[in-house]
């Protein structure tokens, strides 16, 4: 179908960049906590994409699609009061629209 072709195309368009890791844990309540975190973050920052991933046994929440470190730093400064343990990670990102 056209839809699955589009999904493959979209996945291949990822580029190298930076995101901000808000959460990384493998405790019993990590699934629930990571879901709540995504919901809270998305309410506060609706313009910034939030990605929740599970790489057994860890749940991770990572946010943003930043092409360069300075953009990531700027956003980290914006959120550091709400998310004091947040840090920048280098990841493949979705190109900003």
Indicate residue ranges for each PLM-predicted region.
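Acidic/polar low-complexity segments and flexible, solvent-exposed patches
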Residues: 1-97
């Amino acid at each position: 179908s056209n839809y699955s072709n589009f999904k493959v195309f979209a996945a291949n368009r990822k580029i190298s960049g930076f995101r901000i890791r808000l959460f990384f844990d493998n405790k019993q309540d990590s699934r629930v906590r990571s879901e709540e975190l995504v919901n809270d973050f998305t309410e506060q920052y609706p313009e910034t994409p939030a990605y929740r991933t599970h790489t057994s046994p860890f749940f991770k929440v990572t946010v943003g699609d930043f092409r360069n470190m300075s953009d990531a730093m700027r956003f980290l400064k914006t959120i550091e009061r709400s998310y004091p343990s947040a840090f920048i990670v280098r990841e493949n990102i979705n190109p900003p629209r």
